[in-house]
Amino acid sequence: MDCIEVRGFYSSTEEQNPEQQADISENISSLFSLKEQQKMSEYSGLASNHSQMIAEDSEIQPKPEHSPEVLQEDIEMSSGSSGNDFSGNETNENYSSGHDSHGHESDENGKDSAMLMESSDCHKSSSSNAFSLMIANSEHNQSSSGCSSEQSTKAKTQKELLKTLQELKAHLPAEKRIKGKSSVLTTLKYALKSIKQVKANEEYYQLLMINESQPSGLNVSSYTVEEVETITSEYIMKNADMFAVAVSLITGKIVYISDQAAAILRCKRSYFKNAKFVELLAPQDVSVFYTSTTPYRLPSWNICSRAESSTQDCMEEKSFFCRISAGKERENEICYHPFRMTPYLIKVQDPEVAEDQLCCVLLAEKVHSGYEAPRIPPDKRIFTTTHTPTCLFQDVDERAVPLLGYLPQDLIGTPVLVHLHPNDRPLMLAIHKKILQYGGQPFDYSPIRFCTRNGDYITMDTSWSSFINPWSRKVSFIIGRHKVRTGPLNEDVFAAPNYTEDRILHPSVQEITEQIYRLLLQPVHNSGSSGYGSLGSNGSHEHLMSVASSSDSTGNNNDDTQKDKTISQDARKVKTKGQHIFTENKGKLEYKREPSAEKQNGPGGQVKDVIGKDTTATAAPKNVATEELAWKEQPVYSYQQISCLDSVIRYLESCNVPGTAKRKCEPSSSVNSSVHEQKASVNAIQPLGDSTVLKSSGKSSGPPVVGAHLTSLALPGKPESVVSLTSQCSYSSTIVHVGDKKPQPELEMIEDGPSGAEVLDTQLPAPPPSSTHVNQEKESFKKLGLTKEVLAVHTQKEEQSFLNKFKEIKRFNIFQSHCNYYLQDKPKGRPGERGGRGQRNGTSGMDQPWKKSGKNRKSKRIKPQESSDSTTSGTKFPHRFPLQGLNTTAWSPSDTSQASYSAMSFPTVMPAYPLPVFPAAAGTVPPAPETSVSGFNQLPDSGNTCSMQPSQFSAPLMTPVVALVLPNYVYPEMNNSLPQTLYHSQANFPTHPAFSSQTVFPAQPPFTTPSPFPQQAFFPMQPFHYNPPAEIEKVPVTETRNEPSRSCTPQSVGPQDQASPPLFQSRCSSPLNLLQLEENTKTVESGAPAGLHGALNEEGTIGKIMTTDAGSGKGSLPAESPMDAQNSDALSMSSVLLDILLQEDACSGTGSASSGSGVSAAAESLGSGSNGCDMSGSRTGSSETSHTSKYFGSIDSSENHHKTKMKAEIEESEHFIKYVLQDPIWLLMANTDDTVMMTYQLPSRDLETVLKEDKLKLKQMQKLQPKFTEDQKRELIEVHPWIQQGGLPKTVANSECIFCEDNIQSNFYTSYDEEIHEMDLNEMIEDSGENNLVPLSQVNEEQT
């Protein structure tokens, strides 16, 4: 056995005297030197050669018997556990590794290696000999033959080998050492790994440069080495701890390094010659260096070398941190210092190579401990970190480097708890519980101790926050803002730690981490916004959420949690049981549960209450608490959530589904009738009911409960793109007009219901529980939460499956209640109206309005306003009933913006006169007299912002200004300085629903501010003669505001109207009237510059009244006499009035939802005034004035049947046409010329402003004019000889910097800033003797 022979050899050498041992060593060396001449092909004979070698060696010396003691010593010397005793254990480790590298040529070798690795002691006397034997054998594998006289050389080689190995061991990271000592095997493996990594990176770098053809080098400046030295010297000369180095991105070698580097890195300057920069880096930082110096990511040096750029600006480029070797502090131990590296991309002209080589210039600044002089001030010792729910560092602020001693790459991806003091780790669980409780809001907690790199602890005060995923409402990551309170004992945080043992995860660390992870799986139920940009970060969202949450939850969070739990269980049951049954049961259950007071609110409120009660009754086990949190959050809506919800709804609406399926909703009465049945089965159905409740209730509608199994939601196209998470305020921007796939009816129902109620609820954060109506309204918000769940479905596949069921339930239950509720002309943001929802549910005609014939019908949702509650302050709103045939969307709360009380538009209204407000007319005309007329006297009840008494009309012409307006035009904003005008004849308006047939409005007194309305006399007072059918019981109350109101026309709304249906965008009462309105608008516009335009359509329907800000004209056109409208057929008469009222109501209700964006309308109606609508105060803001919005879109005003679907975007008009052909209502619309449609969407622009902007852009572009090359100049001279005489301006032809002082000549550049068309060559160039020079513009044309 080879192993026995080796041991015999070891024992024999031990027994020899020193002289004999020396001879033996020489003989062995000579044998191995001969073996070095063997070729690599002899590997196959390694085992036999090895045996032969041992035999030969043993023949030289007599073979004594193997002493067990000596054998044991020899074996023990190879333990490898002793890092310091290199000659012993390391030698044997090399021996074993050498054989391992060759695959253990023989079993004996393998056994021998195993035996050698077992022992723990070393024998120094024999280790050197054994080392030489093993090194030669393992490295060279040569046969045993011949001798050599190179003993001295071999001895030196052995010493060098030992020294190199010791130095190599110094590079081994502490975490790879065993008990603080480096083993040879581990060191060699680590060295091999590092070499491979460096080589791979170099190859990748070269491949990258070849493949990309140096794309980033196109605009990179080229410098010589001397120029690089000159440029960088100005940055480093003032800082003794800073040096500059240029590294070739092709070869990785140092092209240039500043003189300071030798002093800072404590080495000779010659050391850097032809050296690769990565060789100076700590092995663990090599990958960071390569990643951070990717060519296409580097900024070009000329970016920061401009005169206007300061040194500080350049240093603020993205930097990274690396450790660079800086000599040896102790023998065999390399010292690394951290440096902040700021990279730039340049080209360096290499004299040895023809082409310039792409290089990276690095400004390296040594980083010192923040606790050593010059110290970082205590109040500046602040840094931030983020970590994941699994407690792994995700990001570390670079400010932490001098404070913690760790580089960012050292911490990222490592457990947070490992770096904390063991006694402080349990605090992290409590902190994360509070994070979940605060829902993104920052908070402070008790200090924690953090271990720095040198092993000492610092004490930090931390402000914790989190980012809440707006889709799943779960914590995405946790943010900590740390301030160091107490520094470490050892101020040098970069010093090596005193201990070397590995940081092994303590069992408590793993346990706490798991608890935190499970905790953060729960959705955040708190409505608070994320302090760092998650939901509600805009502030207004937070307010909305907080308000809604307080009232929705009714202060009982437990109920919500229980609801959520039940919901999760119900979701599973829903799968097993019929969805329809489930939804029906749910609807009944909801109704029954709803308290009588909430019944008043209507199905929306009922559902909410029912859910609360039902879910509490059926509270699920506590293990569902996490789910509850998810659901709970939903009742509280942020703008962002609502927007997402709206987008989903629009997506569903866009799907091609029969209108009947979409509109199918049972009357609220039917729901009530089924209440008893449902109640009977409440217990059995509870899980289902809960799930239904979930679907119907806002809370339950929140993101699916953790652990709840959800089926995938089959949605067309791009549900995930429904909304931008950041577009929280821009409601219209979130609207998505989606494709043609057929959505499921329930989805569509959801979309419809929420569209009205959602917008309402979201728009109006319910006012404080001062009024039950407000609370009820907030409950509606909860229902909207169901749609929010739909959003969650997009991001969570498990939720998708649940949504399908949810959609059905929502459609039948919530949707019915919502539909009834919305159809009943609930003002979009009025909490009080919710109180009347229950009553409205019973109103007849609900079904009809809900049926939608338009397949593409898109209900416009109003952007949730800041807080409807704040505006309404708990006031009651008159009950509004939907008109039969009226577009459902128009009646949706979003449509009936708080501005529903806005000025009522009358066909013959004088454009410039403010309209009287009818106190009771908050809603549009009810479809039938049966609808209780809120009555003019009900104005106070309406609780609308219209607090004015019937006699008092607050803002003349503000929103109330009425004019027959062609949808195309924007009208000038009414002067808010105008005095409030009162109609003295207001008494003429009877409180009873019907208008007196001959009611006449007395002439309006002239406005105090004549400037906006100079032609007031021009408009004679025209009495309104209305003989409305008895069915018209309500007249919208027109509330004027003192503030000027900009009509909420789609134009004024801007992009927001894009969400509205095509008809609404067209702003035509019917498709037939589109062209007529177009013509009328033209005539009216030409007739007068008046800001108000009125026109009657042929059918006698009064054009929608709208006031818009016109940049210029303030005059108003006289409207056609009211008699014309009256002369039209009876249907047209009622329809006209209906249209006006509906228009008034819907537009105001929508807050220009149709006119601009249903979403923006909400904001406008809530008083944001974004549209210029004066909605904030009265909610009747200019949204009323945007009469052109929805009802212009309504299809047939004469029939009063508005079966239109809002067109979300003009770009989708083609998509819209696809469905238009399927519905007769849209046939005419489909054939309408695109130019006509476009006319209604062009925003007004100030000519002067536009020209000014264009001129500014032209000036900027002028400086970027191309310059001629020499070849081009020669060609031009051949064609245009005058150019050679200096006719071409230098601004065009000059190839040098025209801004340099040396190049500026007299008046060459004086005219450079002038418009191009104004520049003439005669003025710009010196006399060239050429009298026929052409203007520069002409020259430019020739050049092009």
UniProtKB/Swiss-Prot annotation:
<feature type="compositionally biased region" description="Polar residues">
    <location>
        <begin position="667"/>
        <end position="684"/>
    </location>
</feature>
<feature type="region of interest" description="Disordered">
    <location>
        <begin position="1"/>
        <end position="21"/>
    </location>
</feature>
<feature type="compositionally biased region" description="Low complexity">
    <location>
        <begin position="549"/>
        <end position="559"/>
    </location>
</feature>
<feature type="region of interest" description="Disordered">
    <location>
        <begin position="823"/>
        <end position="894"/>
    </location>
</feature>
<feature type="region of interest" description="Disordered">
    <location>
        <begin position="1107"/>
        <end position="1126"/>
    </location>
</feature>
<dbReference type="GO" id="GO:0001222">
    <property type="term" value="F:transcription corepressor binding"/>
</dbReference>
<feature type="compositionally biased region" description="Basic residues">
    <location>
        <begin position="852"/>
        <end position="862"/>
    </location>
</feature>
<keyword id="KW-0090">Biological rhythms</keyword>
<feature type="compositionally biased region" description="Basic and acidic residues">
    <location>
        <begin position="583"/>
        <end position="597"/>
    </location>
</feature>
<feature type="compositionally biased region" description="Basic and acidic residues">
    <location>
        <begin position="560"/>
        <end position="573"/>
    </location>
</feature>
<feature type="region of interest" description="Disordered">
    <location>
        <begin position="1149"/>
        <end position="1197"/>
    </location>
</feature>
<feature type="compositionally biased region" description="Polar residues">
    <location>
        <begin position="1045"/>
        <end position="1059"/>
    </location>
</feature>
<dbReference type="Pfam" id="PF21353">
    <property type="entry name" value="Per3-like_PAS-A"/>
</dbReference>
<feature type="compositionally biased region" description="Low complexity">
    <location>
        <begin position="1149"/>
        <end position="1172"/>
    </location>
</feature>
<feature type="region of interest" description="Disordered">
    <location>
        <begin position="661"/>
        <end position="686"/>
    </location>
</feature>
<feature type="short sequence motif" description="LXXLL">
    <location>
        <begin position="358"/>
        <end position="362"/>
    </location>
</feature>
<feature type="compositionally biased region" description="Polar residues">
    <location>
        <begin position="10"/>
        <end position="21"/>
    </location>
</feature>
<dbReference type="InterPro" id="IPR050760">
    <property type="entry name" value="Period_circadian_regulator"/>
</dbReference>
<feature type="compositionally biased region" description="Basic and acidic residues">
    <location>
        <begin position="825"/>
        <end position="836"/>
    </location>
</feature>
<feature type="region of interest" description="CRY binding domain">
    <location>
        <begin position="1244"/>
        <end position="1344"/>
    </location>
</feature>
<dbReference type="Pfam" id="PF08447">
    <property type="entry name" value="PAS_3"/>
</dbReference>
<dbReference type="GO" id="GO:0005634">
    <property type="term" value="C:nucleus"/>
</dbReference>
<dbReference type="GO" id="GO:0000976">
    <property type="term" value="F:transcription cis-regulatory region binding"/>
</dbReference>
<keyword id="KW-0804">Transcription</keyword>
<keyword id="KW-0677">Repeat</keyword>
<feature type="compositionally biased region" description="Basic and acidic residues">
    <location>
        <begin position="99"/>
        <end position="111"/>
    </location>
</feature>
<dbReference type="Pfam" id="PF12114">
    <property type="entry name" value="Period_C"/>
</dbReference>
<feature type="region of interest" description="Disordered">
    <location>
        <begin position="1038"/>
        <end position="1065"/>
    </location>
</feature>
<keyword id="KW-0963">Cytoplasm</keyword>
<dbReference type="GO" id="GO:0000122">
    <property type="term" value="P:negative regulation of transcription by RNA polymerase II"/>
</dbReference>
<feature type="compositionally biased region" description="Polar residues">
    <location>
        <begin position="1177"/>
        <end position="1197"/>
    </location>
</feature>
<feature type="compositionally biased region" description="Low complexity">
    <location>
        <begin position="78"/>
        <end position="89"/>
    </location>
</feature>
<keyword id="KW-0805">Transcription regulation</keyword>
<dbReference type="Pfam" id="PF23170">
    <property type="entry name" value="bHLH_PER"/>
</dbReference>
<dbReference type="GO" id="GO:0007623">
    <property type="term" value="P:circadian rhythm"/>
</dbReference>
<feature type="domain" description="PAC">
    <location>
        <begin position="445"/>
        <end position="488"/>
    </location>
</feature>
<dbReference type="InterPro" id="IPR013655">
    <property type="entry name" value="PAS_fold_3"/>
</dbReference>
<dbReference type="InterPro" id="IPR048814">
    <property type="entry name" value="Per1-3_PAS-A"/>
</dbReference>
<dbReference type="GO" id="GO:0005737">
    <property type="term" value="C:cytoplasm"/>
</dbReference>
<feature type="region of interest" description="Disordered">
    <location>
        <begin position="531"/>
        <end position="609"/>
    </location>
</feature>
<dbReference type="GO" id="GO:0043153">
    <property type="term" value="P:entrainment of circadian clock by photoperiod"/>
</dbReference>
<feature type="compositionally biased region" description="Polar residues">
    <location>
        <begin position="865"/>
        <end position="875"/>
    </location>
</feature>
